[in-house]
Amino acid sequence: MDLHNIREDYSKQELSQAHCHADPIQQFEQWLEEAITAKANEPTAMNVATVLDGKPTSRIVLLKEVNPNGFVFFTNYQSRKGQAIEQNPYAALTFFWAELERSVRIEGRIEKISAEESDRYFASRPYTSRVGAWASNQSQVLSGKSELVAKAALIAAKHPLHVPRPPHWGGYIVLPERIEFWQGRPSRLHDRICYRLVEGKWHKERLSP
């Protein structure tokens, strides 16, 4: 399959270092709000990359909170990503908003959030999603789809109203050490503004595309 001629020339906006926030979290929040306003497809979807047994692995996960400390998502702690994080507590996140010709890359240490925070979020989920968290042994082999459906039915019968949070399910927060903002520009002369955390302070610099 020849893909050589598939390309786009980006020209919608430019990214000025002088106009970027001093705090990259604030810059991210601004860009995320603009992606939501522009009705970008799945604006909170991000690629989460981890390393397990020395090999990189990645998957798409939804961002559920951004705060001054970092970026929060929820998952099954016994999944492959959970195993990778247990073994190597660092992750890289990538957001891509094609509608705005923008991308954000985030790298940092990752740790579990408190059980209380996970409980609050789990309680806010739809009933069927809470049932699914119990029914799915994420990343494990199934004999067939019917096995999963039957298990979900058993969980629903056991918990017709209140579904408690499984102990193996909860949130992680990525504590950023490096955040890069990418804005597509004509002739592949893209804008790249990178923030690095050095001794507790953010340093901002422009990178060559």
Curated annotation (Swiss-Prot):
Matches recorded under Gene3D superfamilies: Electron Transport, Fmn-binding Protein, Chain A (2.30.110.10)
Keyword Oxidoreductase in annotation: yes
GO process terms (BP): pyridoxine biosynthetic process
Positions contributing to FMN binding: 59-64, 74-75, 80-81, 138-139, 182, 192
GO molecular function, one term: FMN binding
CC cofactor: FMN
InterPro entries tied to this protein: Pyridox_Oxase (IPR000659), Pyridox_Oxase_CS (IPR019740), Pyridox_Oxase_N (IPR011576), Pyridoxamine_oxidase_dimer_C (IPR019576), Split_barrel_FMN-bd (IPR012349)
Pathway: Cofactor metabolism; pyridoxal 5'-phosphate salvage; pyridoxal 5'-phosphate from pyridoxamine 5'-phosphate: step 1/1; Cofactor metabolism; pyridoxal 5'-phosphate salvage; pyridoxal 5'-phosphate from pyridoxine 5'-phosphate: step 1/1
Manner of cofactor binding, per the entry note: Binds 1 FMN per subunit.
The reaction(s) this protein catalyses: pyridoxamine 5'-phosphate + O2 + H2O = pyridoxal 5'-phosphate + H2O2 + NH4(+); pyridoxine 5'-phosphate + O2 = pyridoxal 5'-phosphate + H2O2
Residues bound to substrate: 7-10, 64, 121, 125, 129, 188-190
EC number: 1.4.3.5
Annotated keywords: Flavoprotein, FMN, Oxidoreductase, Pyridoxine biosynthesis
Similarity-based family: Belongs to the pyridoxamine 5'-phosphate oxidase family.
Role summary: Catalyzes the oxidation of either pyridoxine 5'-phosphate (PNP) or pyridoxamine 5'-phosphate (PMP) into pyridoxal 5'-phosphate (PLP).
The protein's assembly and partners: Homodimer.
Record NCBIfam families: pdxH, PRK05679.1
Protein name per its UniProtKB record: Pyridoxine/pyridoxamine 5'-phosphate oxidase
Upper taxonomic lineage: Bacteria, Pseudomonadati, Pseudomonadota, Gammaproteobacteria, Pasteurellales
